[in-house]
From Swiss-Prot:
This is one of the proteins that bind and probably mediate the attachment of the 5S RNA into the large ribosomal subunit, where it forms part of the central protuberance. Part of the 50S ribosomal subunit; part of the 5S rRNA/L5/L18/L25 subcomplex. Contacts the 5S and 23S rRNAs. It comes from the Bacteria. The keyword rRNA-binding applies. It holds the Pfam family Ribosomal_L18p. Transmembrane segments: none annotated. It comes from Polynucleobacter asymbioticus (strain DSM 18221 / CIP 109841 / QLW-P1DMWA-1). This is Large ribosomal subunit protein uL18. Belongs to the universal ribosomal protein uL18 family. One of its GO terms (molecular function) is structural constituent of ribosome. SUPFAM superfamilies: Translational machinery components.
Length: 117
């Protein structure tokens, strides 16, 4: 089993646990150059709020989407949009990535902006 297969297995197990708990899910999608975050409804099919460094208006403000500062801005933005939609309590789905660097920056910014997880 290689590194990516291990990450995908961890992500699958996390998503199963979150689905059993019937909680809103804050999911992080990370690439080398961009980061995205989406808040899913408890059923897992409806996106309640989303933010990404690939959004046109954010690309002007964020020069490099692959660093911790960009991740923090995305975390703050997705949290504001989720709170506006009425979602405060979420389960954090880090997609099998370690809680470090960009993932940690996004999570801390989302907590500061009002999400609880």
């Amino acid at each position: 089993m290689n590194k990516d297969e291990s990450r995908q297995r961890r992500a699958r197990q996390t998503r199963i646990r979150i689905a059993e708990a019937q909680a809103n899910r804050l999911t992080v999608i990370r690439s080398n150059t961009h980061i995205s975050a989406q808040v899913y409804s408890p059923c897992g099919t409806k996106v309640v709020a989303a933010a990404s460094t690939m959004e046109k208006d954010l690309r002007q403000a964020i020069k490099n989407g692959g660093n911790a500062q960009a991740a923090a801005q995305i975390g703050k933005l997705v949290a504001e949009r989720a709170v506006k939609a009425g979602v405060v309590d979420v389960a954090f789905d880090r997609s099998g990535h370690r809680y470090h660097g960009r993932i940690k920056a996004l999570a801390e910014a989302a907590r500061e902006a009002g999400l609880k997880f």
